[in-house]
Amino acid sequence: MSPQTETKTSVGFKAGVRDYRLTYYTPNYKTKDTDILAAFRMTPQPGVPPEEAGAAVAAESSTGTWTTVWTDGLTSLDRYKGRCYEIEAVTGEKNQFIAYVAYPLDLFEEGSVTNLFTSIVGNVFGFKALRALRLEDLRIPPAYSKTFIGPPHGIQVERDKSNKYGRPLLGCTIKPKLGLSAKNYGRAVYECLRGGLDFTKDDENVNSQPFMRWRDRFLFVAEALFKAQAETGEIKGHYLNVTAGTYEELLKRAHCARELGVPIVMHDYLTGGFTANTSLAHYCRDNGLLLHIHRAMHAVIDRQKNHGIHFRVLAKALRMSGGDHIHAGTVVGKLEGERDVTLGFVDLLRDDYIEKDRSRGIYFTQDWVSMPGVLPVASGGIHVWHMPALTEIFGDDSVLQFGGGTLGHPWGNAPGAVANRVALEACVKARNEGRDLAREGNEIIREASQWSPESAAACEVWKEIKFEFEAMDTL
């Protein structure tokens, strides 16, 4: 008899409330290659043993509820239940533990990040027995990851499409983020692209507002892009934000972008939702569009150390749902991001096989079994003086995006783009010659500025600008 129909009459039904740990805490369990594994940072309420708290997490995120129900006898709970198989105390923290939970693969719909998250980070996060709960990491088994298409194209295909190799790509978010007319917006795009940038970008706030409707923006941006391409001989792109209030409207905008012949569109994947994002990724793969992903709203979810979801989990979810770029912090700019933590999830985005490394916050070995990689985007409060550090930290397979660091140049957008391109080329050349970017970075930028007045002006404007605040999310 199948597990779905078997009835355990021999056991009988005993109504009442049982401790979760009697069923869901299984310290002798040996995890399977097909299990989805989760690491939760949990802070139990006073008086709640960690074993009971960990078991409650496993129960409430899988088959359990607060009381025994007679329909438990109509299925095989041993087959479907989540299991808390290990608990460890967090060093230096009082009453805080890492609970490791294994979930059988049958609990989750194939190819659906939405269903995965609904279970694992659903109602359990409001459970009263826990003061706080944070999902630190997930291990996605190959048997499950192969049910997703992942990024529409991936790093190598993007390199081949753009014919750009051996260096990071350069981008810029058009500012002011709101208020420009479509024609002035298109002019700003043109100036940046002709100055030497590879990409320009819609701000995540830009959708289709009264001051600039989406179709007008698309038309003026496409004109600017093709004009810059013709003048420079380089392939250019602009991230046209197709995020919309309905999926039907989103798809209409993506279709218009494809008809205009632009190479890339953009989506706000957290505010837009995983279902819409996965559908858009499928559309982009089928229609030859690259997909840039912005993470607006992520800090609401991931910034607090004790509660929420760590960004490394959101990054893994995005790689499965689909995106060719995603914003990943800068380490050196104005936005949150500790170096070791950031490089940990950058590797999870780009690499095929990532070993467990607790020093970088990676709780599980992750094998993506040849799923295409995602380019991390460094963006937020960066300028020419940051270029050596960014090149050294992120390497070639990245997008370095300077918004204010381009458009804030005293001579205008095109000189700002020139300054950033000169700085990048100088850093790549110095690195390839064996120079130490971390130690000699400022000297390398000064040397390049001798031959570029645009770079010299940028260096003078931003020489005193620093964002030196301690990161909230540390190991």
From Swiss-Prot:
Name of the molecule in the record: Ribulose bisphosphate carboxylase large chain
Catalyzed reactions: 2 (2R)-3-phosphoglycerate + 2 H(+) = D-ribulose 1,5-bisphosphate + CO2 + H2O; D-ribulose 1,5-bisphosphate + O2 = 2-phosphoglycolate + (2R)-3-phosphoglycerate + 2 H(+)
GO molecular function: magnesium ion binding; monooxygenase activity; ribulose-bisphosphate carboxylase activity
List of catalytic residues: 175, 294
Chain residues that bind Mg(2+): 201, 203-204
Requisite cofactors: Mg(2+)
Source species of the chain: Huperzia lucidula (Shining clubmoss)
Chain positions with N-acetylproline modification: 3
Keywords: Acetylation, Calvin cycle, Carbon dioxide fixation, Chloroplast, Lyase, Magnesium, Metal-binding, Methylation, Monooxygenase, Oxidoreductase, Photorespiration, Photosynthesis, Plastid
Site (Transition state stabilizer): 334
Binding site for substrate: 123, 173, 177, 295, 327, 379
Similarity annotation: Belongs to the RuBisCO large chain family. Type I subfamily.
